[in-house]
Amino acid sequence: MRALVSVWTDSGFAALTWENCVMILVGLVLLYLSIAKEYEPLLLLPIAFGCIMANFPNTGFEDEMGVMMAIGFGIKYEIFPPLIFMGVGAMTDFAPLIANPKTMLLGAAAQIGVFVALAGAMMLGFNVQEAASIGIIGGADGPTAIYLTSKLAPHLLGAIAVAAYSYMSLVPLIQPPIMKMCTTKEQRKIKMVNLRPVSHFEKVVFPIVVAIVVSLLLPPVAALMGCLCLGNLFEVSGVTARLSDTAQNALINIVTIFLATGTGLTMSGDKFLRLETIEIIVLGLIAFAAGTAGGVVFGQIMRIASGNKINPLIGSAGVSAVPMAARVSQVVGLKDNPSNYLLMQAMGPNVAGVIGTAVAAGTMLAQFGG
C-alpha cells in the first residue's frame, strides 16, 4: 500500500492543478483546429502539443534546465525567427512588388493596425514594451511577432504567438467582411492591367538594396531583413539552387518544429490563464482588422489618384500573411467579376507587408528596446 501511495504522490496526477487541466484542454482544441480544420497546421499543431506537454506536472518541461532550455535557447537568443525568414525569403517572389513599386505604400498602410493595437494596449494598462509586442500581431507575421516579443516582453510569448498564428489562419474569414464594408461592388469589379516583366538583374539587385537600406536605417531588425533577403538571393541568383532548396524546405521545416514547439512549452497554466491573455487576443483581432481596413482605405486613395486603375481590394493584402491575404483579394474580386484576376497584383502589397511588418518591429525595437 505504501508503494502505491508513493507512486501516486510522485505521479503527475497528484500535482495536477485546474490551470493545467484547462491548458491541456486548450491544447487539445488547438490540435483539433490544426488537424480537422487545417488552421495553420504546420504551426498550430506543434504549438498545441507543446502546450499540452508544458502542463504535465513533474516532467521537467517547466524547468529552465530541462528540455525547455535546449529548445528555448533558439527563441530567447532570437535564432529561430531569422532562420524562418531565410526560408520565407527563398519562397517569396518580389517580382510583383518590383514591377509595381507603388504597392509598397499599401504594405506600409496596413501597418496602421500595429499602432492602433499598441495604443489600445497602453490604454488597458500594459507597459510600452508589452503594448508594442501585442501591436505587432496586426502585421499577421508570426516569426516577427515572436522575434519582437522575445526581446521586449518574453512573458507574453505564448499568448501573442497563439493569437498571431490563429488570426493568420483565419484570414479568409476575417478579411472579406471588412473589405466589402470599405468598398462598393463597382470598385471591386475594377480590372487591373497585367504587370510588366521583371528582369533577372532587378530580381538580384532588389534584395541586396533592401538589406542594405533597412539594416542601416533600423539596425535592430537587420537579422530579420538580412536573412529574408539572403534567402531570396539564394532563389533568384540562379547559382545556389541547392541552398535555396534547403532554405525553403529542410531548414524552414526543422526550425518551424523547434520554434512552434518551444512557443507551446511556454504556455503553462500559471502563466497563460490570466485576464491579460483575453485582452491580448481581443487586441490582436482589433489590430488585424484595423490593418486590413487601413490597407483597403489607402487602396481607395490610390484608386482615386490613378483614375480607377487600381482595385482597392489589393490593399487588404498589405498584411504580411503570405500568400493567404493575396488569395483573399483574388477570391473577393472574383465574386463580383468572374474575369477579374488580382492575385499577382495583390502579391505586391503582400510581400511589401512582410517588409513593412519587419520595419515596424525594428522601429519599435529602436524606440522601446532600451
Give names to the regions the model predicted:
Residues 97-118, 268-295, 346-350:
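Entry/N-cap segments of selected transmembrane alpha helices
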Residues 211-295:
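Transmembrane helical segments that form the transport core of multi-pass membrane transport proteins
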Residues 155-173, 283-291, 314-315:
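Alpha-helical transmembrane segments
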Residues 30, 53, 74-98, 231-234, ...:
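Hydrophobic transmembrane alpha-helices of secondary-active transporters
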Residues 166-239:
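Membrane-embedded hairpin module used as a gating/binding unit in multi-pass transport
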Residues 36-44, 61-72, 91-106, 240-249, ...:
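Interfacial helix-loop-helix linkers and transmembrane-helix boundary segments
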Residues 1-66:
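N-terminal alpha-helical transmembrane segments of multi-pass membrane transport
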Residues 77, 85-91, 106-116, 120, ...:
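Alpha-helical membrane segments and immediately flanking helix-loop junctions
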